[in-house]
């Protein structure tokens, strides 16, 4: 069985020839292009391996393409304002978007807007889910990083504002990027800021594990899958590689390029805006405002390939190509629904049901279907009725059986009495 193909997905702010391009990572061959708009920074996301979503730069809508129908825009998801960042949950159930200082959470299966989170004081700049979709992290221009529990957000009282699980306020300038490692609720999160620091946090405890100070502002951060290295993109075009395994025990330390031989990637002429590492950790992809995307060998820090675009790079990431991306016969399991701009229940003034969720079976079928809870109630009613009938039927059979036994006892007593009388007559009146 052939190994999954790794591809690079890139966008730029010009979008003259296409909105998004996909090329094979190692050969550099162009595989796909998507047309229909300009994707903003931190605004590109893959939904359930079936759709590609792109938040439009300075626009109040999100473009959605079916992966294999690259030339046909599937849907425009209208939003209340310009989308500053976008992400999807790894399980494909939810879409998160930052709009001004608010975070919007949609349910993919229904298109319902479940909640609007308003805990940032300035624009939200980056969003990302943990690998198990149990938590998501948000960073903003207010210098705050918030860790949210998805379960707590969905179960919160509609009359009360959901609270984040952790509030990380150690940065002093706007947050520019964040990266969430593997481990679900035990994951580690790297946050980058214009204050020239990258900080490493633990989701479970909320503790600060590491803070690295650089000489320039950091606009992009990522880690390899094994989390041995952390890569930080600077405003001067440099990319710094931090070895997390051999880092000294102190929690805060300055990164000194002259003392970190071979730990700096140099080649970009302008600020580095996005970074991504291949699954085996051997290749690093970087995008910059110098309108180039570069592929680097991590071991030697040498540039393997340079791809020139038509404008500043807004998104560049490495991913395993989904089956739907390379197969022309593949179709999504479910169509993408219409995404609501208003909270669930608020659009039609349905106050009693605001914030509630209804699980339905067979959403792809036409017509009204009973809800899951209604079906459970019907099943319980049938089971109770059957049990009652069985109990009543058993009592009737018991009464009939008792009557039969009583009749049999009476017959036996009569026979016994007749035998006694016969024996008495024989004894008292012997035959002559």
Swiss-Prot record:
WD repeat ranges per the UniProt record: 36-75, 78-116, 119-158, 170-211, 213-257, 267-306
Location relative to the cell: Nucleus, Nucleolus; Nucleus, Nucleoplasm; Cytoplasm; Dynein axonemal particle
Keywords annotated in UniProt: Cytoplasm, Developmental protein, Nucleus, Repeat, WD repeat
Subcellular location, principal: nucleus
GO biological process: DNA-templated DNA replication; rRNA processing
GO cellular component: dynein axonemal particle; nuclear pre-replicative complex; nucleolus; rixosome complex
Pfam short name (any one): WD40_alt
Disulfide bonds: none
InterPro entries, alphabetized: G-protein_beta_WD-40_rep, WD40/YVTN_repeat-like_dom_sf, WD40_repeat_CS, WD40_repeat_dom_sf, WD40_rpt, WDR18/Ipi3/RID3, Wdr18_C_dom
PROSITE patterns in the record: WD_REPEATS_1, WD_REPEATS_2, WD_REPEATS_REGION
Function recorded in the entry: Functions as a component of the Five Friends of Methylated CHTOP (5FMC) complex; the 5FMC complex is recruited to ZNF148 by methylated CHTOP, leading to desumoylation of ZNF148 and subsequent transactivation of ZNF148 target genes. Component of the PELP1 complex involved in the nucleolar steps of 28S rRNA maturation and the subsequent nucleoplasmic transit of the pre-60S ribosomal subunit. May play a role during development.
Similarity section: Belongs to the WD repeat IPI3/WDR18 family.
Subunit structure: Component of the 5FMC complex, at least composed of PELP1, LAS1L, TEX10, WDR18 and SENP3; the complex interacts with methylated CHTOP and ZNF148. Interacts with NOL9. Component of the PELP1 complex, composed of at least PELP1, TEX10 and WDR18. The complex interacts with pre-60S ribosome particles.
UniProt name for this protein: WD repeat-containing protein 18
Annotated organism of origin: Bos taurus (Bovine)
Gene name per UniProt: WDR18
